[in-house]
Amino acid sequence: MFRGPLDTPWAADVSPSGPRGIKAGRSALLVPILGSIWGAWRPEPGATRYRTLDPMAAVRSSSRLTPFSIQAILNRKEERAHTFPRLATAVSPACCWRIFGESEAEGLGSPCGGAPGAGAGGEPSGWDSDSALSEEGELGRPGDIGERKKQRPLEARAKGEDEEETPGCSDCEIGASVPDPSPPDEDPKCEQLMLEPPKQRKKRSRAAFSHAQVFELERRFNHQRYLSGPERADLAASLKLTETQVKIWFQNRRYKTKRRQMATDLLAAAPAAKKVAVKVLVRDDQRQYHPGEVLHPSLLPLQAPYFYPYYCALPGWTLSAAACSRGTP
């Protein structure tokens, strides 16, 4: 029998023969190693487990293995809360889910969970520690959650006061600030504008030229379509007109002449009517009908009576007359 550091009996059959002896030899090699690991991990009988304020010791302890039991995990969280009291007090019960019906008024009244010096033992039994924020540094700065909770009621109060002060204006001030919703037709100024007749646009008076002036302008235009400045001034002075009147008359005359020329060109470009030679069938000196043939409508010889079934209806139409007309050219 071999006993390890913890006085744990380890049964090892060390007989060298057979497969059982080989397995026993392997177990004999593993027993000292496992025993040394267990001896290093087991705490001393009188020592307090991880109840230290040294942060490095807490970090070292966090790297060790933890038994997979709910009670061990909860104890580990409580130990970390004792190790870092500042972080434990920063966790607000108002941030966690409440499973035992803790009132919202108490959570708002004490957002930080009591005095700053209170430890994890002072936490109410109503909130679940597993539903708190993560322990890996997601809490943020201490006191931020409490400050936000305090600021929310203050902001609500400030908004309520602003809403109360806004409608505090008197009815006169509101009436003065709001424009009159009445339509513009009711305004007296608008009524006056509607009653007044619309102002007609003042037409520019056309210059009335005398026959002598028009004759002289046309003669000069046929001779010279464009006038220079001195020539225009000389012509205006001789006709007792202004230079602007002479200038406008020449412009209008050039425009009319151009339009007439374009119309003439279009008519000239149109294809002329084609003349077709027609054979003359009737001449002026030839007589078409004889005096006795006017009563008879047909001049062609009749071959048989059945070609003309209605010959009996004609007055004076007989076979003898038809036979006589057969010999006419």
From Swiss-Prot:
Instruction: Give GO BP annotations, semicolon-separated.
Output: cell differentiation; positive regulation of transcription by RNA polymerase II; regulation of transcription by RNA polymerase II
Q: Where in the cell is it found?
A: Nucleus
Region entry Disordered, spans? 107-188
Molecular function GO terms recorded: DNA binding; DNA-binding transcription factor activity, RNA polymerase II-specific; RNA polymerase II cis-regulatory region sequence-specific DNA binding
**Top-rank lineage group of the source organism:** Eukaryota
Instruction: Locate the compositionally biased regions of type Basic and acidic residues.
Output: 138-160
Q: Which InterPro entries match?
A: HD (IPR001356), HD_metazoa (IPR020479), Homeobox_CS (IPR017970), Homeobox_NK-like (IPR050394), Homeodomain-like_sf (IPR009057)
| Keyword DNA-binding assigned | yes
- The entry's DNA-binding region feature spans 202-261
Q: Name one GO cellular component term.
A: nucleus
Which Pfam family, any one, appears in the UniProt record? Homeodomain
The recorded induction information for this protein reads: By foxf1-B.
Q: What are the record keywords, sorted?
A: Developmental protein, DNA-binding, Homeobox, Nucleus
Is Nucleus given among the entry's keywords?
Answer: yes
Q: Where is the composition biased (Gly residues)?
A: 110-124
What does the entry state regarding organ or tissue expression? Answer: First expressed in developing facial cartilage in early tailbud embryos, with expression localized to the basihyobranchial, palatoquadrate and possibly Meckel's cartilages. Shortly after, a second area of expression is seen in the musculature of the anterior gut. During late embryogenesis, gut expression extends into hindgut tissues. In adults, expressed at a high level in the kidney, pancreas, spleen and stomach and at a slightly lower level in the intestine, skeletal muscle and tongue. Adult heart, liver and lung show little or no expression.
Q: Which family does it belong to?
A: Belongs to the NK-3 homeobox family.
Q: What is this protein called?
A: Homeobox protein Nkx-3.2
Q: From which organism does this entry originate?
A: Xenopus laevis
Q: Tell me the lineage of the source organism.
A: Eukaryota, Metazoa, Chordata, Craniata, Vertebrata
The encoding gene is nkx3-2
